[in-house]
């Protein structure tokens, strides 16, 4: 599906699939849980899912003649960390807009974790007080204009790389990679669980798994707390990506499976249940998830198993997208573990 698209390699190769045997047993042993470790995909600044997307965006950035990558996210954005890492790797400058997406007041929130790593890698980081929104942001457009005005050649990468024209391609590749691994494993996964916010990870998976009829087996766990906007953006990106890769069929709103039950209380703020899911996964599997994204999708998967959403004998693949560096910004919440 992706053969005709240029890809700039930023990852080690196919990410490993790990059986979560102790977590599965703890939850009753009727459902087999596995994790695809996107959090271990690269040596670039702790890796994560955004690198899969950026592999298909970097060739376009280089071809454009740009000298500065310009992107946006929250203060503890994993995406902006990855953009900073990629800029360093390919020899470009980086301008980052970090908006106040999360009403979180840990004393060191804007000085540790992802934002600290971006600064270490040389990004020009600007803090902006605007609140959360997954759409196109005026602060980002202003940053692009400022780079131009200073004589630079900006290349614009939206939040999460999601509404970029190539933003969905990387996770079409994820689906193709899973199919190859399934042949080696000798079975196919019945469900894929993924955290959904800006939408292109879910959308790319939806398109990729639509090739073998599993588009509605991709279970998005909303962490945006703005599910209507997120659902619409996933569908828009999926349709555009399907056209790009010649999927050959129309995708409908019903193809976007998005569970809205675990994003509370608000984007970026973990509930008691999210924190307990983070602890449970860490203590049973040594697998670290974060309070913003993966903790909520882990909470969702655990709860769905407990409620019997997955039938007995189902094999469920949890897409671990990364994000652990953000935990540093939540030190007080986990001060006792």
UniProtKB/Swiss-Prot annotation:
A GO molecular-function descriptor: D-cysteine desulfhydrase activity
Family indicated by similarity: Belongs to the ACC deaminase/D-cysteine desulfhydrase family.
Stored HAMAP family: ACC_deaminase (MF_00807)
Keyword flag Transport: no
GO terms classed as biological process: 1-aminocyclopropane-1-carboxylate metabolic process; amine catabolic process
Source domain of life: Bacteria
EC number: 3.5.99.7
Top-level taxonomy: Bacteria, Pseudomonadati, Pseudomonadota, Alphaproteobacteria, Hyphomicrobiales
Active site: 77
Catalytic activity as recorded in UniProt: 1-aminocyclopropane-1-carboxylate + H2O = 2-oxobutanoate + NH4(+)
Role according to the record: Catalyzes a cyclopropane ring-opening reaction, the irreversible conversion of 1-aminocyclopropane-1-carboxylate (ACC) to ammonia and alpha-ketobutyrate. Allows growth on ACC as a nitrogen source.
EC class of the enzyme, as a word: hydrolase
Assembly and interaction partners: Homotrimer.
Species name: Methylobacterium sp. (strain 4-46)
Cofactor list: pyridoxal 5'-phosphate
Keyword Hydrolase: yes
Post-translational modification N6-(pyridoxal phosphate)lysine, affected residues: 50
Name of this protein: 1-aminocyclopropane-1-carboxylate deaminase
UniProt keyword terms in alphabetical order: Hydrolase, Pyridoxal phosphate
Transmembrane feature ranges: none
